[in-house]
UniProtKB/Swiss-Prot annotation:
Name recorded for this polypeptide: Elongation factor-like GTPase 1
EC code: 3.6.5.-
Organism: Mus musculus (Mouse)
Reaction equations catalysed: GTP + H2O = GDP + phosphate + H(+)
Gene symbol of the encoding locus: Efl1
GO biological processes: cytosolic ribosome assembly; GTP metabolic process
Amino acid sequence: MVLSGVDKMIRLQKNTANIRNICVLAHVDHGKTTLADCLISSNGIISSRLAGKLRYMDSREDEQVRGITMKSSAISLHYAEGHEEYLINLIDSPGHVDFSSEVSTAVRICDGCIIVVDAVEGVCPQTQAVLRQAWLENIRPVLVINKIDRLIVELKFTPQEAYSHLKNILEQINALTGTLFTSKVLEERAERETESQAKPHSEQGEQVYDWSAGLEDVDDSQLYFSPEQGNVVFTSAIDGWGFGIEHFARIYSQKIGIKKEVLLKTLWGDYYINMKAKKIMKVDQAKGKKPLFVQLILENIWSLYDAVLKKDKEKIDKIVTSLGLKIGAREARHSDPKVQINAICSQWLPISHAVLAMVCHKLPSPLDMTSERVEKLLCTGSQTFESLPPETQALKAAFMKCGSEDTAPVIIFVSKMFAVDVKALPQNKPRPLTQEEMAQRRERARQRHAEKLAAAQGQTSQGPTQDGGALETSPHEDEPRGDEPDVASVSRQPVSQEESSQEAFIAFARVFSGIARRGKKIFVLGPKYSPVDFLQRVPLGFSAPLEDLPPVPHMACCTLENLYLLMGRELEDLEEVPPGNVLGIGGLQDFVLKSATLCSLPSCPPFIPLNFEATPIVRVAVEPKHPSEMPQLVKGMKLLNQADPCVQVLIQETGEHVLVTAGEVHLQRCLDDLRERFAKIHISVSEPIIPFRETITKPPKVDMVNEEIGRQQKVAVIHQTKEEQSKIPEGIHVDSDGLITIPTPNKLATLSVRAIPLPEEVTRILEENSDLIRSMELLTSSLNEGRNTQAIHQKTQEKIWEFKGKLEKHLTGRKWRNTVDQIWSFGPRKCGPNILVSRSEDFQNSVWSGPAGRESKEASRFRDFGNSIVSGFQLATLSGPMCEEPLMGVCFVLEKWELNKCAEQGASDKQHQGQCDLAGEGQGGGKTCHVGDENQEQQDVCSEPFEETSQKGDSPVIDCYGPFSGQLIATMKEACRYALQVKPQRLMAAMYTCDIMATSDVLGRVYAVLSKREGRVLQEEMKEGTDMFIIKAVLPVAESFGFADEIRKRTSGLASPQLVFSHWEVIPSDPFWVPTTEEEYLHFGEKADSENQARKYMNAVRKRKGLYVEEKIVEHAEKQRTLSKNK
């Protein structure tokens, strides 16, 4: 660095009011990294000629090759304006949807953001996503409309057309901002209404309903983007220029003689200037007057581009002279017009000044953090700020004050961990020597040289040695000795090969309060840590070293070993970091997995989890090429899991090591990192493991050729159903409505189960509230264990009743009567989109009885048996009968549950759950039971005999089939599976929402690729003023691999898709369908050789899992020969 040294950055870090923590957000290829290059070049870190070409913040090789940013990188910049100096902590973030998790890690530690929008493409899908992320994190945005040069060079717009186009873009992004604002106001209003309804009405009087939405009472004047407010800048980052209207208002106020304040309000908008009267008036479109923005700003820029592109040297010289610029001879003679434009515009309208001035004036400092954001960061789950302990609420003042006193609590948030090579750390780099150190080295070299000469003269007087060995010196002799205090000697020690190949993990963090000092001990709080638990375990006023504190779950103590200043590709050592700054922390790899909260006070709660837009959905199994390298693979996958905020690493029940990523590009990057950085071995990667879900539907009304199912076909379907039911083992009864009645192996209990498809809306509600359902389960277990959850119980209970009300709203009708109150469990994993309903008269239990009510005596009595029933339901929903995939949208109704008295007595007596004792055979009068024939060794596998006998006077009822709870689990699982098989089964495919931008020339090819891959177009919209189309479609995840490459090849790179996981969709075709009608035989053939999509997916999953696959084989192979015989 030339202009901004580390010492200056350390000095600027102490002035919190002049710190700006910002990130650059945009759709892919809208110019984020090019803009960052321009801002970095203003500090002299890179040459201004390389800005936009070097991509300084893209330090990975694959980032440079692909031309897209894949990770968030931070750099500290210095900006001076007058007597004020500012420190800009700039974070460049990715625009590709696969890496949207990196955007989440960036916006959490920022106070503001720059939204970059392409002037040609306008507001794109990922622009909406990043703006929504910024809104959710309560950070203030400013707008940069980039690539204005494309309007001139590519689209050939006139200044008037360009002005209209820019107005449309501004209206689009303001409409999006208004939508976010409106939804927030309406949510707050709904919360207030819920609270008011919960309060009892003291007076019974006439109630008046307020029909207003509450939008009129909220000030949104500072919310929207508007050039006159100074939060919009127009730029061309590749050409190095940019401006806000404040720059031209200052110039023209002196030339025209109109006040700067007036020009600020009228330079953007439909205003024109009357030069005779020197007044600014409204534009009358009929008279063809030009707006001020066109007349005073755009026409000047257009004329400059026109002169340079036409190589009008006389006009160029005139413009340069009038602007008072100095252009070098090399740039003036250059044949590339871009070089000349960059040389002129970067001096006339420097982009760095326009953008950084807007950042300093319009974006907040760490001192301006709103109380709303502080409360949102501290309140996890369903908590409210008022429900937190008083010690925790007191931390709000520390956030707002951003104090740097010694008594201020140190609060740091780690948003992600990133890996760097050990050799790239500052302590392992050779540092330049100071003048004093160089003088000391010269003096020591002279002394050594004099000693060698003296020794050589002494040896010469005694006699020369062979080969002149006395005069030879070791090549390392001039190096400083180990005991000499030389700074460079430490860093120049050879690094072992093992150490040089290691990766060090640095925490990407921000200090919210207090001063982070090297060597300070601090608490690391996990996401499940609760300050309430700590305050209950540790007595008030406890003062001792942190190591002596009693163990508290999800809390550890660590030392801040190394602090770093993040400078893009470089790291600089720091001794301390004041509050409000972004920093890197070394030595936390053993304490932090992905993100964490660091605090000097244990009363601080962990920050709310990061909000990820993209859901990991793409799975692959990995294994080493050589089995002996499995330990390296396991270690590498652990490092990869820590280095990537979005990736998930799983070990399945089969022993497979599975990577779960957000998309195809993200998958490729993770595999490259695994091979080259973390595991450093050759690995084998399976085909993508496509997730599916199994469900049931109502019986279809039309057949496969879209004809209504008639009587004959209904008979055929019934016959087919009976054939399927005939495969069900004996002893299981199936009635006409699909009710399965199945006894346990010991005949002590009988279960009657029915499967019903849930409405789509109910399934969606269950998916959206999975976190709340999980909280209900945790609360129920907490209450059963006697733990205190009163602090959050009331707020959670309100959400539970709201969730219950939504279910009651959509589960209406005769067959769903009282269903919500009878919900016993959710599944799989007790928080999935399937429900278990208990309609048994003898046994009734409800999921609402735990968190929202009291458990009945009968439910408490049969709790052990009930847990077995629920466990069987969980197993059944975890793997369905078609291809062992989880179920979705299925309601299992337990119609009857009959228990014999023997089983009831067994439940009441715990001794009856033990195994039978062979030694008691003589005393029990034949009450023991043995399994196996006489030749086999008798095994003690039976339960203790029950004392009661049957009414018929038979021998005592003996359980020979293992523990009764295990029999209930297996029986319930089988009952659910059989209940599914007697209903029309369907597969559900994971679906991507696909946003494709393409020109009109290649629109047909895009549609062809989509239809080939089972895609479905939902919407097609043309961007106004361009020939670009935005196509919104849905595409199965199973068909998405290679989709981006194929569509780019077919369209010659003119179409670029963005894939985001959206929802699950039922595949309409029946995977077990066979032709039954004459029309179906004609259309599909006798054997239905053209197998349907669902069967293809089902068989692929079954093959992968090693399950039986029913495939067609050639019946008469010799009849396939078509070669004619020679006679």
